[in-house]
Amino acid sequence: NDFDFDQVFEKQVQALGRPGDVLVGISTSGNSRNVIRAVDAANALGLHTIGLLGGTGGALQGKVGLPLTVSCTPHTPRIQEGHLLMVHLICERIEEIMETPA
């Protein structure tokens, strides 16, 4: 309880992240300090990073390995709906890959 809210995700990444893991950061502005710090920690540990972002992508646009940005609207609810669609598509693709025999 002695840590700032800006560190809430960063501390988890530092404790649990391993090279080869994937961190997905979600921020409608791309400027959420707690997500930025988590991405910075992930990058320092060699994790792959994906950003579900909005607008211009903010500060996270240049920090994540794969920025996925909903830039067609400035409205937070629409950005979040775009993020939800992205998550569903990503999960669907992962399921397809896992079901395919090697």
Q: For the regions a protein language model found, what residue spans apply to each?
A:
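Glycine-rich phosphate-binding loops that contact phosphosugars or nucleotide phosphates
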Residues: 1-100
